[in-house]
């Protein structure tokens, strides 16, 4: 869905995909983590401490509730009472002078006062010495970051917007490119541009363990960063080794297409000769949409101009697999909506493990209506305009199925490499062409598991195809209306479990996430056609984007879960029998973890993301007898910065709305004073299955609002969001905007009753779905609670958004017209009851079209509603980055909010002309 200023403080170019993101996962970053896409073995192996001293960053304090008791604090001015809003009234200070100021004081009285004053000073000094020596007080700079402090002392530096926008508060993090060894060795990874090393090297983590006798030696794949061909020099952007590590597929001249996809020139690099040749023989400039290795390392399949081709490495001959590719027919790559909402990838090609078959999607979007994206300043196509058309905008027509419109027709095809033919397998009971979504394809030996749903995502079928016999059958059919009336979320984490009778697995199977116990849980289906699983997890919690990995040697499944808390993430392991579920991470302490496993699941990169300063380390998994641990990242610079700055006071808790416990975080100014009245900015995303309240380390825009501007910033995850049970999630089905806005209004009323809140200065803001929810909340509230709002790139009518995302939650406009009408932002009279609101949108937004904002503006015009401001950004997509636009967005948000809380918008509501100054007449 719309990209959002997301829960992980990341700004992405698409509505957040609604698991932990918006409809289309969050992308670009103002995030607190930065992924180094380059493999990080150099960091793992070069001069790294043996252990990470996490005691340096202990978690202290407890979760706050609504009536937390606060210690008295230093009353340093925040911007709440400082230069933005003016200081305290002079009447609060004495402005009277004694009438005896000019009189002389009796000498003995002065002597007596001097003695008493000296005694008092001496007493104060002695007390101060005792106070300091007892360590009852420390300046803020002497503490490591405490994310759960309820008070802050000291006078450190202020958090600035520039720091946030320049990513100075972003935690460093790294990704590891795990690969399997030629003979299946575990623990190998790719290292690119390591210190004092060749450009691309295969390393073995076990080499750093003196007790390991199985460690492989380093292997150089590419010596130099640059390579030459036909007297031209090239620099690879993408490097993908073959499974046998004898060749490397390189991509140069990469040009982005949509969120995930790109065009590039591809090369085959020979490791032995260190020479490259074009993937397409005799055409070194061929721009391809996709290229991928055969698992047997002897062939590459690629897509060019929407047709698929095969090149076997033992010859220059190219085999054309499909011939019907066109502007409307895609082979092996997805169209816009499948890339954005289904696959979350630019890849729709899947090799069988034996290299004998290629499965691929054929997408026909002939019947899908087009939407024009206009570029007024740039020309993303790279093409020069035709003579006489230099002053016209470039227009890109994209096939974009809006809710209720024709969807692309998608079929799964198979290419038999040995026979050289393409075939499909018809299975009885399949969904009709315009009612079918193919959401996941998993090779299971010589068979294929295919997940498909109807277009509104409430009926799912799992189909099993035997490519040898070219037959198939449905092995599972689930109607979610029989469970809770919700929907199926798309997952790409299903794991094939091959049979291993000697290891207790007599049949093939697979591990999948299913609906169970009011949430998402792991299930093991074996044999492949068995619809009745072994439950691996169950209980009042959920698994997250699971499974993470499977250790086939030890029959273990690894996964991330909310078992400890809905706003924490810990890693666990469980046997394929469903027994012995144990934590991998330390559950005795609060934590939010992510994890990346080696190909055999014997090693992992553990990423601690909060609430303390983030860190990373590579470990051996608990069942691996070859024990190993190395720190990758400690973020010492970030820890030092946290010591030297006044960060907001983060209070976590829950509020009860209609009997449902909703998570919140309240960010307070560093010198919070319970005797003051603070304005409040509510920030939310609120999209289905999203989560914004998390126990992660973050110094983001919301932190700046609290620590830099001195306001309170609150986030509440209402109903419809994730990880508080499906019952509270699926209530929004067919009625987007109703319950989410209700919960935001209820939360605002809850805060308005607090003694330290200024109930007349409440604002709400959000991006993407959060922008929609801002407008919907202002509409539903009609100025009763919220006075101000700031909406960026909002949906205003779900009939304008893409079919696959929207219909999952709303069904179709044809079957739910009342729901769509109710969900749209149409009551502009109610919007006029707010003091003022701000609307911003990127003109070239291919995700949430500017049509949404323009339609709302027209409705405002028709009703003569004028209490709003508008900013548009030429050539910016959903992330709003083009030509410095992102900085302007946050500058505008900041200044607009300060003016709102300063009362400036009240002054212009009924603007009146000032009296005219009398012109001075010239004197004679």
Swiss-Prot record:
Keyword Protease set for record: yes
Record Pfam families: DPPIV_N, Peptidase_S9
EC numbers for this chain: 3.4.14.5
Location(s), subcellular: Vacuole membrane
GO molecular function terms noted in the UniProt entry: aminopeptidase activity; dipeptidyl-peptidase activity; serine-type endopeptidase activity
UniProt keyword list: Aminopeptidase, Glycoprotein, Hydrolase, Membrane, Protease, Serine protease, Signal-anchor, Transmembrane, Transmembrane helix, Vacuole
Active site: 768, 845, 878
UniProt GO BP: proteolysis
Gene3D superfamilies in the record: alpha/beta hydrolase, Dipeptidylpeptidase IV, N-terminal domain
GO cellular component, one term: plasma membrane
Catalytic reaction(s) noted: Release of an N-terminal dipeptide, Xaa-Yaa-|-Zaa-, from a polypeptide, preferentially when Yaa is Pro, provided Zaa is neither Pro nor hydroxyproline
Topology versus the membrane: Single-pass type II membrane protein
Region called Disordered, residue ranges: 1-102
UniProt keyword Isomerase, yes or no: no
Membrane-side (Vacuolar) residue stretches: 133-924
Glycosites: 231, 364, 827
Parts of the chain on the Cytoplasmic side: 1-111
Domain of life from the UniProt record: Eukaryota
Entries under InterPro entries matching the protein: AB_hydrolase_fold, Pept_S9_AS, Peptidase_S9_cat, Peptidase_S9B_N, Serine_Prot_S9B/DPPIV
SUPFAM superfamilies hit by this protein: alpha/beta-Hydrolases, DPP6 N-terminal domain-like
Main location: membrane
Bias (Basic and acidic residues): 14-23, 47-58
The protein's role, per its UniProt record: Type IV dipeptidyl-peptidase which removes N-terminal dipeptides sequentially from polypeptides having unsubstituted N-termini provided that the penultimate residue is proline.
PANTHER family linked: DIPEPTIDYL PEPTIDASE 10, ISOFORM B, PROTEASE FAMILY S9B,C DIPEPTIDYL-PEPTIDASE IV-RELATED
Family the UniProt entry places it in: Belongs to the peptidase S9B family.
The name this protein goes by in its record: Probable dipeptidyl-aminopeptidase B
Taxonomic placement: Eukaryota, Fungi, Dikarya, Ascomycota, Pezizomycotina
Gene that this sequence comes from: dapB
